[in-house]
UniProtKB/Swiss-Prot annotation:
Localisation per UniProt entry: Cytoplasm
EC number(s) given by UniProt: 4.2.3.101, 4.2.3.81, 4.2.3.55, 4.2.3.-
Gene source species: Zea mays (Maize)
Protein's UniProt name: 7-epi-sesquithujene synthase
Binding-site residues, Mg(2+) 3: N452, S456, E460
Keywords in alphabetical order: Cytoplasm, Lyase, Magnesium, Manganese, Metal-binding, Plant defense
Function description: Sesquiterpene synthase involved in the production after herbivore attack of a blend of volatiles that attracts natural enemies of herbivores. Converts farnesyl diphosphate to (S)-beta-bisabolene and 7-epi-sesquithujene, along with a mixture of more than 20 other minor sesquiterpene olefins. Can also act in vitro as a monoterpene synthase, converting geranyl diphosphate to (S)-(-)-limonene, beta-myrcene and 11 other monoterpenes.
Any further remark recorded for this protein: The allele found in cv. B73 encodes an active enzyme while the allele found in cv. Delprim contains a frame shift mutation.
Cofactor: Mg(2+); Mn(2+)
């Protein structure tokens, strides 16, 4: 939930509600995705048939890989994961990862191999030590890497971002290699594939990139590599284009749901961002089996946007408290508690949750109960933030994050994603773990909250808003806004280290659980890096076109 404007009377709110808000620009997409027409059934069937043939051909290559050819095997796994194909080969990759982890007999003087091995293992949950890089340090504090060995330099830079607290060798690797890569970039042809790789890494390290966007951007680069595998390349193109068809159908469904929601509820003041919300949530659950997760996530995000804008911008304290009371009842009879403008929305919200139960079927519909609990907690904490607003109370940073790390909807979103997964390893214990708000999800929540606040505070300070974490830090430590923002950027960076440490320590949970949280972190970083792209969504237009509009030429 964003920061709040000052408390308004019911009369003022009633005067505003029929009007569309001038605060938010209209949708950039209109009815574009509502008019989507899929390819004919034979066309799609042919694409799927060819993709299946290629998948098995690539599987044979993967099964033939051994740790005796470690550089080739590590590079193949990294390539498949970057191209968005790793999902199809989880068993084969897991087996190879275990062998790579267990086999310490490799060339520890090959900086590129050491970096790629470290990156691959840590990214996939193996807590390998970082002291393998100590032997590459020079007396001057840099890292021994020949000027011509630019690939090793880039691999080291990307590997170092999988760092934990106290790993000075990785901190030094980042600062040292960043300078060398920046210098190198100035000497490369701007349009060369390697220049694009370096530029992308300096902007966003490989570990922090949104997986589906990385696949879309990397496929054309992989196509230029002399060592490319033609079957892998063709499969990557086909797989992305097939996924794009699924994404467009899901977007059409979600857009129709949203338009009906707004038309029937008459809540014209809310942000019209259903395409951007789908793009955001897609970044967390882009693998083929997670269609229902993407749909549930997008609808939940849409509902949260409406509730947030009611609490944030248009609702009086009295109206919001009535909504909070009705919300926890989950029954149409509660509409008598609500003001007129909230009643239709409340009914439509109940219908949406019922549609989730119907889609999940009798074996998994219990998951919606946990999702409802998460949403109840969210609305309850929104009410606490309203009290802070009305009392003009400025909490400490710590106190603020105790609440706001949850009101950024971390529990609701993780439960939404888990709810839609067909994976039977997602059980009641998974939801109970998430609802307990464990430290791993709390850290993720702090990361999202701080990322949001650091880009939205300057915009919101022009209005009568209650304090964000930036303002809390300014008051608590007596700093300027610029200094507070710099400190919060440091805390955001620390959150990545915290999440990595905490994920490596997790036991007894399905592998997809921490993977999802990291994918949420990546897609959130993409939304809030340097700007609030949900509110000002022009920044996302090119990326949305790449993912949902433009197929890759085959």
């Amino acid at each position: 939930m964003a920061s709040h404007p000052a408390h308004r009377s019911s009369k003022a709110a009633d005067e505003e509600l029929p009007k569309a808000s001038s605060t938010f620009h209209p949708s950039l997409w209109g009815s574009f995705f509502l008019t989507y027409q899929p390819p004919t059934a034979p066309q799609r069937a042919n694409m799927k048939e060819r993709a299946e043939v290629l998948r098995e051909r690539v599987r044979k290559v993967l099964k033939g890989s051994t740790t005796d050819q470690l550089p080739e095997t590590v590079n193949l796994i990294l390539t498949l994961q970057r191209l968005g194909l790793g999902y199809y080969y989880e068993n084969e990759i897991d087996k190879l990862l275990h062998q790579i982890y267990s086999n310490s007999d490799y060339n520890v003087k090959d900086l590129n191999l050491v970096s790629q091995r470290f990156y691959l293992l840590r990214k996939n949950g193996y807590d390998v030590p970082s002291d393998v890089f100590l032997s590459f340090k020079t007396e001057e504090g840099g890292f021994a890497c020949a000027a011509a060995d630019t690939r090793s330099l880039l691999s080291l830079y990307n590997a170092a971002y999988l760092r934990k607290h106290g790993e000075e060798v990785l901190d030094e690797a980042i600062s040292s290699t960043r300078l060398r890569l920046q210098d190198l970039l100035g000497r490369l042809l701007p349009e060369s594939p390697f220049a694009k790789e370096v530029s992308s890494s300096l902007r966003t390290p490989l570990f922090r990139r949104v997986g589906i966007l990385e696949a879309r951007n990397y496929i054309p680069i992989y196509e230029t590599e002399a060592t490319r595998n033609e079957a892998v390349l063709e499969l990557a193109k086909l797989n992305f284009n097939l996924q794009q068809l699924d994404f467009c159908e899901e977007l059409k469904h979600c857009s129709a749901w949203w338009n009906e929601m707004i038309a029937k509820s008459k809540l014209t003041f809310v942000r019209d961002r259903i395409v951007e919300e789908y793009f955001w949530m897609n970044g967390a659950c882009y693998d083929p089996p997670y269609s229902l997760s993407r749909i549930i996530l997008t609808k939940i995000t849409g509902l949260i946007t409406i509730i947030d804008d009611m609490f944030d911008t248009h609702g009086t304290t009295e109206d919001c408290m009535k909504f909070a009371e009705a919300f926890g009842r989950w029954d149409e009879s509660a509409i008598h508690l609500l003001p007129e403008y909230m009643k239709d929305f409340y009914i439509l919200m109940l219908e949406t949750f019922q549609s989730f139960e119907d889609a999940l079927g009798p074996e998994k519909s219990y998951r919606v109960l946990y999702l409802k609990q998460a949403m109840e907690r969210l609305v309850e904490l929104y009410s606490k933030e309203i009290k802070w607003r009305d009392d003009d109370y400025v909490p400490t940073m710590s106190e603020h994050l105790q609440v706001s790390a949850e009101t950024i909807a971390t529990i609701a979103l993780t439960c939404s994603a888990y709810a839609g997964m067909g994976d039977m390893s997602i059980r009641k214990e998974t939801f109970e773990w998430a609802l307990s708000f464990p430290q791993f999800i709390r850290t993720f929540g702090s990361f999202v909250r701080l990322s949001n606040d650091v880009v939205s505070t300057k915009r919101e300070q022009t209005k009568d808003h209650s304090p964000s974490t930036v303002h809390c830090y300014m008051k608590e430590h007596g700093t300027t806004m610029d200094d507070a923002c710099e400190k919060i950027k440091e805390l955001i960076e620390d959150s990545w280290k915290d999440m990595l440490e905490q994920s490596l320590a997790l036991k007894g949970l399905p592998k997809v659980v921490p993977q999802l949280v990291f994918d949420f972190s990546r897609t959130t970083d993409n939304m809030y890096r340097d700007r609030d792209a949900l509110t000002s969504s022009e920044a996302l237009k090119e990326m949305i076109q790449l993912l949902f509009v433009e197929p890759i030429p085959e």
